[in-house]
């Protein structure tokens, strides 16, 4: 009887372990660094030391936070499509004046995560997990890589 109870408990534990491992993780963690040098975007000097959402570096590429104001300043828009659960990022929008968003001083290495939702850039769906320079999230904000392919092409 005791052996049967132990076998049943082990079987239940195995089933729970398998079931929990099948649940996809929402986001994968990575590390990025806060940009420490002088930052100029579109001719505007950015005070990254006190920025609420600082520019970050990942794999030697600078990433900018897609806040409402900074995105418009860069001529980029990000729209959430609730039907398809996709973040649509589009370049070429009207640019606005720079509006600083200040916060606490940040420096060093920070934890960033890959989003679990789908992403399209200029109408093309991307496989963000396979990107050399993926789009990621930090402090609830989407960060976009300033690569040649995205910034110029």
Which positions does each model-derived feature cover?
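Primary recognition of N-terminal secretory signal peptides and signal-anchoring hydrophobic helices
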Residues: 2-11, 20-153
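Hydrophobic membrane-insertion alpha-helices, especially the h-region
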Residues: 13-15
């Amino acid at each position: 009887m005791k052996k049967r109870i132990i076998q049943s408990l082990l079987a239940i534990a195995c089933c729970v372990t398998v079931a929990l491992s099948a649940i996809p993780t929402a986001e994968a963690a990575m590390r990025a660094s806060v940009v420490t040098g002088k930052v100029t975007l579109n001719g505007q000097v950015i005070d990254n030391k006190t920025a609420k959402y600082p520019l970050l570096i990942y794999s030697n590429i600078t990433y900018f936070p897609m806040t409402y104001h900074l995105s418009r300043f860069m001529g980029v828009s990000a729209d959430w499509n609730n039907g398809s659960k996709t973040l649509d990022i589009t370049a070429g929008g009207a640019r606005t004046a720079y509006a600083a968003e200040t916060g606490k001083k940040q420096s060093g290495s920070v934890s960033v995560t890959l989003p679990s939702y789908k992403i399209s850039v200029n109408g093309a769906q991307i496989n963000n997990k396979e990107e050399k320079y993926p789009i990621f999230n930090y402090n609830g904000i989407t960060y976009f890589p300033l690569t040649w392919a995205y910034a110029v092409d």
